[in-house]
């Protein structure tokens, strides 16, 4: 039986960003240095495939520090943690490694700098997301006000409209964030803006790659976890760009094939915590059902790398 023709357009860049790659290496190197088990507070990155692989290697994932014994090392996830977490680890004399993405740490430092200068912070982010919790937890309670939508801006009650600054979660929709920033600047003209955009390069690049696909495709598949903020934003970007079908799938087994009937051009993107092996799995699934042509649509090359913490570098360099 002849397979129907279909073109897969692969978004590039896609998949692992430098912060995710660094965080995964930290867990792997910690296991090599200290042996299993190594405890990780929260999923190191939001991807089940990655977490399951590290669990098989000996990582134990917990949600709170008190679930980890004091005699084993603990790693903080790439999303960042409130200041109270490392303080508690030190109080308990625990060995810990902070895998917070350096670009998230930059936002933390930015918030602290503004706080020291007497400014009240407004954070654009998603309530309950670990990154938002970690960033807001850098300052005393009440010093950071959270907004999620343009509508939230109207309801803000600030101490002094002349003494404000805003920061953002690094994995937001660029377009949605721009609208919220515009609302903030309209209501609070004196608000201090970041020296550099807080939304990270990888989020920006992956959303740009999806937009570049949009005029060629009828459907979009985003490979990523449902709790991955940046992956969910890619689905939203695809829908906003006019994709009739935009699915978020963790594995090829989750693809809704019925929704792809009659489709001849599909875009494939991957969130910043999705490994390339899952992209290969999706391509293989399409080749089983379609006469598949694969085309790469590359918008930018990424060359960003982040070093792992010194405690692990020294272990790796020791002969």
Curated annotation (Swiss-Prot):
Reactions mediated catalytically: isopentenyl diphosphate + 2 oxidized [2Fe-2S]-[ferredoxin] + H2O = (2E)-4-hydroxy-3-methylbut-2-enyl diphosphate + 2 reduced [2Fe-2S]-[ferredoxin] + 2 H(+); dimethylallyl diphosphate + 2 oxidized [2Fe-2S]-[ferredoxin] + H2O = (2E)-4-hydroxy-3-methylbut-2-enyl diphosphate + 2 reduced [2Fe-2S]-[ferredoxin] + 2 H(+)
Short name of any one Pfam family annotated for the protein: LYTB
Keyword S-adenosyl-L-methionine carried by entry: no
EC code(s) of this entry: 1.17.7.4
Keywords, alphabetical: 4Fe-4S, Iron, Iron-sulfur, Isoprene biosynthesis, Metal-binding, Oxidoreductase
Function: Catalyzes the conversion of 1-hydroxy-2-methyl-2-(E)-butenyl 4-diphosphate (HMBPP) into a mixture of isopentenyl diphosphate (IPP) and dimethylallyl diphosphate (DMAPP). Acts in the terminal step of the DOXP/MEP pathway for isoprenoid precursor biosynthesis.
Similarity remark: Belongs to the IspH family.
PANTHER family according to UniProt: 4-HYDROXY-3-METHYLBUT-2-ENYL DIPHOSPHATE REDUCTASE
The protein, known as: 4-hydroxy-3-methylbut-2-enyl diphosphate reductase
Gene: ispH
